[in-house]
């Protein structure tokens, strides 16, 4: 019997009596991170990393939360369980499950480049690895994040010369905090959409150091924004809310900006290839370093990525789940099928 089963409620460890990132309410849920496609309301008990707990409280409301540190060991009905850094966002964790000599690891979402706030991705040796493949095609290859940060700084400087407000679109948990760190040493006044401001306040209350942030508010005079920087979720694009910053220009921060057509279709002033997910090489590196004999692929470019792993001699299979992009990130990826041929064999 498999240590983790793929059920209609989520990833289930029968021996331990718990689910990992269930998409339906269950008795005991172990959560990899606070994004809405992995952390859902309604379960009776939640286990997560210490930094994830306040974010679950923000998003799901009061609940029965238990939190642990990375590497701390728990036993559930004789099953050994521990959390390890995934590098996706603050608090994001891989879940290591061990029982009767068998080790499985559930990655959740992850990236392999250390962003300085999410914890460096930790390869965890296992027999079976359950991975995402959001950017599981060879066309997705990230440049070092510092190069992207430099481009963002230069773009903002050019906008200021023409009196334009720079509006950066980035989802409220993960990317927004990276941008705040990126802009921390500037003398610019930083403004944020309410969703980003609320997350910022919670994180600051729990010891995180981010630059001062002003919430966008109807009572603020319009000229206060001119030449400044506004950080907003992608869902704000094209709304009446964003038009109050006129004259403004939009910069989208997403891995989907690797494909230029996405930027053209969304009429953005700039696209910055900044992702909280591993690229093609990062996915392959992570899998190699686990030493896994079996790899299950939960979401993303599952067919192409799983096929490639099988061709490399690693048993791999697709798994149907309800994971995908964080809701607001999905707005950026809806056109990806026009740019990437899913039937094309990876050529690396």
Please give the residue ranges for each predicted region.
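Short, charged, surface-exposed secondary-structure boundary motifs
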Residues: 57-58, 76-80, 115-117, 139-141, ...
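Active-site-proximal loop/helix segment associated with metal-binding centers of metalloenzymes
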Residues: 87-97, 110, 114-115, 128, ...
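Gly/Ser/Thr-rich loops at beta-strand to alpha-helix junctions
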Residues: 89-90, 169-177, 299-304
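Short acidic low-complexity segments
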Residues: 10-23, 72-75, 212-228, 234-241
């Amino acid at each position: 019997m498999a240590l983790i089963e793929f059920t209609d409620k989520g990833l289930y460890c029968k021996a331990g009596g718990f689910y990992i990132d269930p998409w339906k309410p269950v008795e005991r849920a172990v959560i990899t991170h606070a994004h809405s496609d992995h952390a859902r309301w309604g379960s009776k008990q939640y286990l997560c990393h210490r930094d994830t707990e306040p974010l679950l409280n923000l998003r799901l409301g009061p609940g029965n939360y238990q939190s642990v540190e990375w590497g701390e060991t728990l036993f559930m009905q004789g099953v050994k369980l521990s959390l390890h850094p995934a590098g996706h966002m603050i608090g994001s964790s891989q879940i290591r499950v061990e029982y009767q000599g068998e080790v499985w690891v559930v990655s959740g979402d992850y990236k392999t480049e250390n962003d300085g706030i999410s914890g460096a991705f930790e390869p965890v040796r296992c027999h079976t690895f359950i991975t995402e493949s959001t950017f599981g095609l060879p066309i997705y290859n990230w440049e070092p994040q510092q190069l992207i940060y430099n481009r963002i700084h230069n773009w903002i400087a050019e906008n200021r010369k023409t009196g334009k407000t720079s509006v950066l679109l980035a989802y409220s948990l993960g990317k927004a905090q990276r941008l705040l760190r990126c802009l921390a040493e500037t003398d610019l006044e930083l403004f944020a959409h309410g969703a980003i401001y609320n997350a910022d306040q919670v994180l600051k209350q729990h010891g995180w150091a981010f630059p001062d942030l002003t919430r966008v508010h109807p009572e603020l005079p319009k000229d206060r924004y001119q030449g400044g920087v506004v950080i907003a979720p992608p869902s704000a694009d094209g709304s009446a809310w964003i038009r109050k910053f006129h004259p403004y220009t939009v910069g989208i921060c997403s891995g989907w900006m690797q494909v230029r057509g996405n930027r053209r279709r969304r009429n953005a002033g700039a696209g910055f290839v900044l992702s909280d997910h591993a690229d093609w090489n990062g996915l392959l590196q992570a899998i190699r370093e686990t030493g896994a004999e079996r790899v299950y692929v939960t979401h993303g470019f599952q067919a192409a990525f799983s096929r490639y792993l099988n061709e490399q001699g690693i048993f791999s299979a697709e798994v149907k789940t309800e994971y995908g992009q964080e809701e607001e990130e999905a707005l950026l990826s809806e056109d990806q099928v026009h740019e990437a041929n899913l039937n094309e064999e990876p050529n690396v």
